[in-house]
Amino acid sequence: MAGHSNSMALFSFSLLWLCSGVLGTDTEERLVEHLLDPSRYNKLIRPATNGSELVTVQLMVSLAQLISVHEREQIMTTNVWLTQEWEDYRLTWKPEDFDNMKKVRLPSKHIWLPDVVLYNNADGMYEVSFYSNAVVSYDGSIFWLPPAIYKSACKIEVKHFPFDQQNCTMKFRSWTYDRTEIDLVLKSDVASLDDFTPSGEWDIIALPGRRNENPDDSTYVDITYDFIIRRKPLFYTINLIIPCVLITSLAILVFYLPSDCGEKMTLCISVLLALTVFLLLISKIVPPTSLDVPLVGKYLMFTMVLVTFSIVTSVCVLNVHHRSPTTHTMAPWVKVVFLEKLPTLLFLQQPRHRCARQRLRLRRRQREREGAGALFFREGPAADPCTCFVNPASVQGLAGAFRAEPTAAGPGRSVGPCSCGLREAVDGVRFIADHMRSEDDDQSVREDWKYVAMVIDRLFLWIFVFVCVFGTVGMFLQPLFQNYTATTFLHPDHSAPSSK
């Protein structure tokens, strides 16, 4: 008996719930038919009691996602929710007549909508992407939140790329109604970020909104939002800037590379070609504008100028390196400046302090001076044309070649006639000795020219290092001192836009 009672109670509750659902559905259906009755409602008519009454539309943008910013095409793609609120006196009812129902959702295409569009659209899609339902309250207030994917025109400032900050505006205005019929009001001073999905390329700095009027045209009004965004430079730093800096450092090594290896010009040209490739990559990213040059483009041009300068200096250094006494004479000031003064300033050890070849050459010349007279000819009108002074100790193995006689030329020396064959041999030895001394002197001059080239290389090495370091730091620190604020990007013409 108790089970039968429980079953009856459950059946009664289910029946009551179904009846209430049917009644609720019937109530909402009656309300929708009442509101959208063609005899009392026309969606083509502006909701105003007379022609002079204004319809106030409150507008607010909620940013859901910053999809992309195409620098070359200068287009910003965003996913936004465009909140619009207004009142329609024709869509009112008494809640007590409809089971205290105070809100109802109506298809937006069946009611009057303010034709608010994005004025600075860049792809022809001026309206929203999806016409969602509108929430209508019993007092006639309407809340409409359609989502939209907009592609708006955005003037890209490339001056500090890739450490740049952009201001992309979105201007909303009624397409057919002017200010005498629809008054656009800014619901919030900033766009909402409650449902924003962070971007991997841009940081949102500020999203201020403002209502613009034109003093010269009383019928003009629009709502403008400034999307102030800053680029995240990590991607371009890793893939563009650091490789450029490393390639530039290779250009520094050109001055440290010995001139004898013959690869100076090859390295310079290779670095120049690599920088040219990076410059071509940048030209495909930034917009083709002549108003500003991007920061990374300036840096590449700076390094290309330095590399070109290194090519010119390398040519000059190679020219100096391969000079010889037969083609050039070293001026005294060159010896003073490049062989005595600059090596000390550039932390180079002077070659005469460390060159073993120079020390050996000096010792050999000293021995030649000490051994002079071991075998020499005496010439003059009183001398026999085939007479020579002889050191007996040095010609013990030449017995019979001549007859020595004591002479006053010095102790241990004698004089006597010698054969013509011996004289030819002595002349040959003298020629060889003179030739070797001449070659040794020429080699000394060539080594001096090589050392001058090395000093010039080291001088330009330090100059190149300082210019590269200070130039790089000066260029890339410049954007860090820029004070970006919301007012920085507000253009003067925003306070008085032209009439459309």
From Swiss-Prot:
Effect of T83K: 20-fold increase in affinity to the conotoxin BuIA (37-fold decrease in K(off)); 2-fold decrease in affinity to the conotoxin MII (no change in K(off), but 2-fold decrease in K(on))
TM segment ranges: 238-258, 267-287, 300-320, 459-479
UniProt note on tissues of expression: Expressed in most regions of the CNS.
List of glycosylated residues: N50, N167
Keywords, comma-separated and alphabetical: Cell membrane, Disulfide bond, Glycoprotein, Ion channel, Ion transport, Ligand-gated ion channel, Membrane, Receptor, Signal, Synapse, Transmembrane, Transmembrane helix, Transport
Marked site (Key residue that may play an important stabilizing role for the interaction with alpha-conotoxins PnIA, GID and MII, allowing them to bind deep into the nAChR cleft) residue numbers: L118
Predominant localisation class: membrane
Catalytic activity: Ca(2+)(in) = Ca(2+)(out); K(+)(in) = K(+)(out); Na(+)(in) = Na(+)(out)
Taxonomy, superkingdom: Eukaryota
GO-annotated molecular function: acetylcholine binding; acetylcholine receptor activity; acetylcholine-gated monoatomic cation-selective channel activity; heterocyclic compound binding; protein-containing complex binding; quaternary ammonium group binding; transmitter-gated monoatomic ion channel activity involved in regulation of postsynaptic membrane potential
Extracellular side: 25-237, 288-299
UniProt xrefs under InterPro entries: Neur_chan_lig-bd (IPR006202), Neur_chan_lig-bd_sf (IPR036734), Neur_channel (IPR006201), Neuro-gated_channel_TM_sf (IPR036719), Neuro_actylchol_rec (IPR038050), Neurotrans-gated_channel_TM (IPR006029), Neurotransmitter_ion_chnl_CS (IPR018000), Nicotinic_acetylcholine_rcpt (IPR002394)
Subcellular compartments: Synaptic cell membrane; Cell membrane
SS bond list: C154-C168
Activity regulation annotation text: Activated by a myriad of ligands such as acetylcholine, cytisine, nicotine, choline and epibatidine. Channel potentiation by calcium is stoichiometry-selective, CHRNA4:CHRNB2 nACh receptor is achieved by calcium association with topographically distinct sites framed by anionic residues within the CHRNA4 subunit and between the CHRNA4 and CHRNB2 subunits. Oligomeric amyloid-beta protein 42 activates specifially CHRNA7:CHRNB2 nAchRs. nAChR activity is inhibited by the antagonist alpha-conotoxins BuIA, PnIA, PnIC, GID and MII, small disulfide-constrained peptides from cone snails.
Site label Key residue for a rapid dissociation (K(off)) from the conotoxin BuIA, positions: V135, F143
A single Gene Ontology CC term: protein-containing complex
Signal peptide per UniProt: 1-24
Site (Key residue that may interfere with effective access of the conotoxin BuIA to the channel binding site): T83
Membrane topology: Multi-pass membrane protein
GO BP, one annotated term: synaptic transmission, cholinergic
Cytoplasmic compartment segments: 259-266, 321-458
Family: Belongs to the ligand-gated ion channel (TC 1.A.9) family. Acetylcholine receptor (TC 1.A.9.1) subfamily. Beta-2/CHRNB2 sub-subfamily.
Subunit structure: Neuronal AChR is a heteropentamer composed of two different types of subunits: alpha and beta. CHRNB2/Beta-2 subunit can be combined to CHRNA2/alpha-2, CHRNA3/alpha-3 or CHRNA4/alpha-4, CHRNA5/alpha-5, CHRNA6/alpha-6 and CHRNB3/beta-3 to give rise to functional receptors. CHRNA2:CHRNB2 and CHRNA4:CHRNB2 nAChR complexes exist in two subtypes: LS (low agonist sensitivity) with a (CHRNA2/4)3:(CHRNB2)2 and HS (high agonist sensitivity) with a (CHRNA2/4)2:(CHRNB2)3 stoichiometry; the subtypes differ in their subunit binding interfaces which are involved in ligand binding.
Function per UniProt: Component of neuronal acetylcholine receptors (nAChRs) that function as pentameric, ligand-gated cation channels with high calcium permeability among other activities. nAChRs are excitatory neurotrasnmitter receptors formed by a collection of nAChR subunits known to mediate synaptic transmission in the nervous system and the neuromuscular junction. Each nAchR subunit confers differential attributes to channel properties, including activation, deactivation and desensitization kinetics, pH sensitivity, cation permeability, and binding to allosteric modulators.
Protein name: Neuronal acetylcholine receptor subunit beta-2
